[in-house]
Amino acid sequence: MNTNNSVMALATTFADRGDWTVEQQFVLQMGSSYLLAHGIGTPLQRDAVTTVEVPADGEYNLLVRTKNWTKHWSDGPTPGIFQVLVDGVADAATFGTDKVDWYWQRGGKIALKKGKHTLALHDLTGFDGRCDAVVLTTSDEMPGDSLDEYRALRARLLGPETPVDKGEFDFVVVGGGISGICAALAAARLGCKVALVQDRYVLGGNNSSEVRVGLGGQINVDPYPSLGYLLNEIGPDRIGNARGAHHYQDDKKLKVVLAEKNITLFLGYTVTEVEKMGDTIRSVVAVE
């Protein structure tokens, strides 16, 4: 697709997400997190709204990256549908009606002046409509639906087109759960320059306030009586599942990690690929 006179807005970066929720579980499968209209059958009351800046006067095609999530099981009407409003006017298309895999669905053609315009996602059913991105473009060519094509398009429109080098490290830990934190701390205290990469904005994995699973297991017992001291540093003072968020002491884990001068922490980064030399991993590539 010719990306001249094109703008992309990722749904999860909308200035106001309204009643839409962020779904982050499928980044590796479809390329990003996305917005979900989870109203349990009741249409969402508040739209997701943002502002985009159009580079020139022109006739712009409205393209939406979405999917028909029920087409796995039925060719009938889908419950997960929504509209897109441009400057408060709903496009005639209903989105989320076609393919079972993520795809670009074409809406209408809209005359726009150079400058700022509003976009809004308006849920129609409350039954889990899905929107990843909205594109306004003067090109009549449809972008490809494959994951590689999507990533390339997003890089051209939003940057960076080539990965930003975040530095070289002796030891890279992918995953900021309990085991990842312990591995990073141990390596850092042995003198390694460490990168700890976590795909959430909180450390702890299952033992974080997001999941709320208590720590368990035997530590400080023979034949390894010293095994467990790191857990005593970062673990919550109390055990138990499904307790209040404060029970899991996310701040305690973060404080210990940030205190280590040899650790560089990357929160909110999902590793999507590795680069190898022979059988040796040389680097990891992540998206924020």
Task: Name every feature range the model reports, one short phrase each.
Residues 1-163:
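Extracytoplasmic
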Residues 35, 278-284:
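Short, hydrophobic/aromatic-rich segments at coil-to-beta transitions
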Residues 121, 283-288:
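Short beta-strand segments that buttress and anchor functional surface loops
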Residues 165-177:
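Beta1/beta-strand and adjacent pyrophosphate-binding region of the FAD-binding site
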Residues 168-170, 191-194:
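Residues that mark the start of a beta-strand
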Residues 180:
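N-terminal Rossmann-fold NAD(P) dinucleotide-binding loop
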Residues 187:
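Aromatic pocket-lining residues of Rossmann-like dinucleotide-binding sites
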Residues 192-193, 198-280:
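Conserved N-terminal/central alpha/beta ligand/cofactor-binding core
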